[in-house]
Structures are given as C-alpha cells and as structure tokens.
C-alpha cells in the first residue's frame, strides 16, 4: 500500500528514532515496562500520520517499527543472560527430537468482547478500579497499574490525533470524513456505539498491537458475533 505521510503531522522516522533512543538512554536502569510505556507514548503522540479521505479506517503511523527494534534488542540481551541455561536445554531437546521450544515474547490474546463493550476509556476505568480495590500494593504492582493506565491514555490520545486529522478534511467539505471524525471522537470518550465505531476500534487496536508493539494477536476471530450487536442497532 502506498502511503502519503503528512509531514506536518509529526516526526519523520529518523527524528522519531533520535527521540526514542534519548528516552531509552535517559531511563537507563529503569524497569523495561516503564521504558516501553514512555516509548509507546512518544510513538503514538509524535509519529507522522497518513489520513486518506478515501479511508473509513485511519490508523497509519510512520513509525518504522522503531519500538519493536528497541524491544528486539532487549529480548536478545535477555535471552543471552537470564534465559541462557533454559534455552540451552531446549536446544538440546530440539536436536534430540524430543520437542521444540523457544522463548516467546510476542503473542497476545486480547479480550475483544471487553474492548468492544467498554472501549479504551472503559478499559482504563476498569483497570484503575481494580487497582483502587486493592488494600496493599507492592512497588512492582504500582508500576504495572501506572504503566497500563498510561498506555491506554496514550492510545486514546492517538485516536484523538486521528479525529483531529479527519476533522481538517471534513472542514474542507468532505462529508465522509465528518462521519469518520465523529466516530473516532466517540472512541476517545467511551465505548463504540455504532458498527463503524466498533470496526474502527478493532482496526486501530489490532494495528497498534501487531505493527507498533509487534505482538502477534491470536484472538481476532468471530467477527460476525462481535459486530452483529452493533449491526442490529
């Protein structure tokens, strides 16, 4: 697919790469979950957009898989240190034709029903409610909840960027973009209410998981059952 990146909408990949490497350097020694969250925020807030007036489902970011490349370095290092003995054992078992096994950091199974029922704002609210319901939290748990909430906030911000970009096309007289923008705007404040909004949210969420974070989403299916309630409305 040919992309038409809006140069005024954000940083080109090389400038984005410089910004991400600085974040990584400045946060050296901090937990990986904290560093990754800040990197994710920067990509979603700053990468260039491609919003096409022919497209009902804008979601494109000019990020050059930079977050994935950085994370890939971490995984190589982790395999060489913490997992070295374990992986040596699985390699021997593989060579002996006992079984095949390897480290896997990249498969997720999102709860699509929860996503479509709650939306990103609802998922964030549920997360914070779960945190607040706990009487005591370790520092590790506090960090997890904070990073998860920040990740969802960044996702809402990205959808708002898409809504702003489609707003500009709508202002030029494009009625289709007016509909697209209105639907995207709904996703920044609540759950999807229409079929278009449900489809938009699914496309955006899938893209962010698979292309920005580079996780292999293994639970996208049953779209007839997922979308049918919205179709009936």
Task: Please report, for each region that a protein language model flagged, where it lies by residue.
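Long, non-catalytic protein-protein interaction scaffolds
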Residues: 1-131, 135
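Structured, charged N-terminal subsegments at the starts of enzyme catalytic cores
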Residues: 124-233
């Amino acid at each position: 697919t040919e992309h038409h990146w809006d140069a005024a909408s954000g940083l080109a990949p090389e400038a984005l790469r410089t910004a991400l490497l600085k974040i990584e350097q400045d946060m050296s020694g901090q937990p990986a979950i904290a560093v990754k969250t800040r990197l994710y925020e920067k990509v979603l807030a700053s990468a260039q957009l491609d919003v096409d007036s022919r497209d009902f489902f804008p979601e494109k970011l000019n990020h050059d898989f930079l977050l994935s490349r950085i994370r890939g370095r971490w995984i190589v290092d982790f395999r060489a240190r913490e997992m070295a003995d374990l992986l040596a054992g699985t390699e021997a078992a593989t060579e002996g034709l006992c079984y095949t096994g390897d480290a896997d950091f990249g498969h997720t199974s999102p709860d699509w029903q929860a996503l479509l029922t709650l939306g990103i704002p609802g998922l964030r609210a549920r997360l914070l409610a779960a945190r607040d319901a706990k009487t005591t939290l370790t520092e590790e748990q506090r960090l997890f909840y904070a990073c998860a909430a920040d990740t969802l906030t960044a996702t809402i911000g990205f959808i708002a960027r898409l809504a702003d970009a489609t707003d500009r096309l709508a202002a030029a007289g494009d009625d289709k973009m007016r509909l697209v923008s209105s639907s995207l705007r709904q996703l920044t404040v609540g759950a999807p209410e229409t079929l278009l909004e449900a489809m938009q949210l699914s496309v955006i969420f899938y893209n962010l998981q698979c292309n920005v974070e580079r996780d292999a989403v293994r639970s996208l299916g049953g779209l007839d059952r997922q979308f049918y309630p919205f179709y009936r409305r």
